[in-house]
Amino acid sequence: MNLLENINSRPLPLAQLMGITFTHAEPDKVIARMVVRPDLCTLGHTIHGGSAMAFADTTGGAATLINLPADAKGATAIESKTNFVGAAKEGSTVIATAVPLHRGRRTQVWQTRLETEEGRLVALVTQTQLIL
């Protein structure tokens, strides 16, 4: 089973609920896509900050899982910081790209860029995962 199949074979209820699709997975990069549906938007018809954060958290979490040390039982986020830079309109597709900043035995730090299909930055998220 390759890394993308590994991620896609896991039960990820929030990812399924939000319509997140993982399209690429390697140790140094995980990419996912999500259509900005009306139920994921603000009253102004742009992606809600909570939806953006959940999308980034899900992508960074998946990246952590495929990079766990062999003796790890799992991981949990212990810190997350989001810089909101731009908007993504209802109906558009947002792409999340997670790359590692640090991969240690006890913690991993991932940075996830959320961009529109046109390449406009929506948010930049940095999260720290505690390895269990």
Predicted segments, located by residue:
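Terminal targeting signals and extreme-terminal segments of soluble enzymes
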Residues: M1-L132
